[in-house]
Amino acid sequence: MKKSLIFLVLLFSCTVIAQSDPKVAFQKTRYELAVSCYKKADFVKALDLFSIASKIKPENELGKESIKKVDTLKTMLRKSIMDKVIGSWKMNGNQPLWSVNATNTNDTDGIDELVEINQKQILFYEVDTKTKAKKLIKTEDIKYYNKEESDALFSAIILSDGTIWNCSLNEDSDILHVINIARQTENGVEKIKADNLERFYSKVN
C-alpha cells in the first residue's frame, strides 16, 4: 500500500512537470529575446517581453529575475520620458497638427490651454490669446499608474478624478500625445476600449 502511494505521488509529480515544461520553455524564449532587445537598447520591447516572462511562471527563477528587470526598465524609461516632457506644452486639439481634421477647441473662445510639467506636478493653465494673461486652473501630482507589478505600462499616469492617461512622445520629442485608457472607480479599474479621449500638445520653446 505504501509503495503504491509513493508510485502515485511520483507519477503525479512527473505529470505536473511534463505539463509545465512547455510553459517554462516559452518563458525561457521570452526572457532570452528580452535580454537580446535590452542589449540592443530596445528598452520598450525588452520591458514588454520581460513582463510576459514574469507572468508565465512568476515563482521560478526566470520569473523572479524578469520582474526585477521590469521594475528596473520602468524606472529607466520613466526617467527618460520625464526628462523630455519637463517644460511648457500648448494643447493643439484631439488630432495631430498634420491632420486636416485636427480641431483646436481653444480657437473659438480666444483661450489657449497650457500645461507646465515639472518633476512632481502638472499645472494646467488657461491663457488669453490677446492679453497673454495666464490663469492657473488646477494642479495634479504626477502619480504613475501601476495595476500590477509585472505590468509593462510605464508611461501611464492617474489623475485625481480617477482617469488614467497613457503618454507618449514623437521622435523629435516636441509633440506629446495623451490618451484616456481607463478610469478607476469604486468598483475597480474600467478600461476604455472605444472612443478614447485624446489630446495632442506641442512643446513651447
Predicted regions and their residues:
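Alpha-helical protein-protein interaction scaffolds
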Residues: 19-79
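Surface-exposed strand-loop-strand hairpins of Gram-negative outer-membrane beta-barrel proteins
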Residues: 100-108
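N-terminal helix-cap/turn-to-beta initiation motif at the start of protein domains
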Residues: 74-90
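Acidic, glycine/proline-rich Ca2+-coordinating loop motifs
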Residues: 91-92, 195
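Edge beta-strand at a domain terminus
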Residues: 180-205
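Bacterial Sec-dependent N-terminal signal peptides
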Residues: 1-23
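Contiguous, well-ordered beta-strand patches that form the walls/edges
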Residues: 24, 94-101, 119-186
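Flexible low-complexity loop/turn motifs enriched in small/helix-breaking residues
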Residues: 81, 95, 110-127, 205
